UniProtKB/Swiss-Prot annotation:
Pfam families: BolA. Belongs to the BolA/IbaG family. Transmembrane segments: none annotated. The lineage of its organism: Bacteria, Pseudomonadati, Pseudomonadota, Gammaproteobacteria, Enterobacterales. SUPFAM superfamilies: BolA-like (SSF82657). This is Uncharacterized protein BU473. It comes from Buchnera aphidicola subsp. Acyrthosiphon pisum (strain APS) (Acyrthosiphon pisum symbiotic bacterium).
Length: 104
């Protein structure tokens, strides 16, 4: 199993505007080798009117066979396109300068 294989599989199942998969396995002590800790960001309008729990259920059900056999931890960030745009705007508009020792 590779990140690219997971990405292609998810893209074949739902209408994805953006997907990014990160392998965080190296940050964890776990006895198995390979992909054990994944973080996935998915932007899809298929998530419109879906609760966060339902969004995660959709993705977990698609990856259930992979999860039970190989993946120890899966972090999901699921957004609609509008939610993602709002999140990006809030992130950039909340930038604050920190003043230390009277130097900006």
């Amino acid at each position: 199993m590779t990140l690219e294989k997971i990405k292609k599989y998810l893209i074949s199942k739902i209408n994805i505007k953006f997907i990014e998969i990160y392998d965080d396995s190296q940050f964890h002590h776990y006895s198995k080798k390979g992909l054990t800790h994944l973080r996935i960001i998915i932007i899809s309008d298929d998530f419109i009117n879906q609760t966060l729990i339902n969004r995660h259920r959709i993705i977990f059900s698609m990856l259930s066979k992979m999860i039970e056999k190989k993946i120890y931890s899966l972090t999901l960030n699921t957004y609609t396109l509008n939610e993602w745009k709002d999140k990006k705007l809030k992130k950039t508009s909340n930038v604050k300068c920190v003043k230390k020792n009277n130097i900006l």
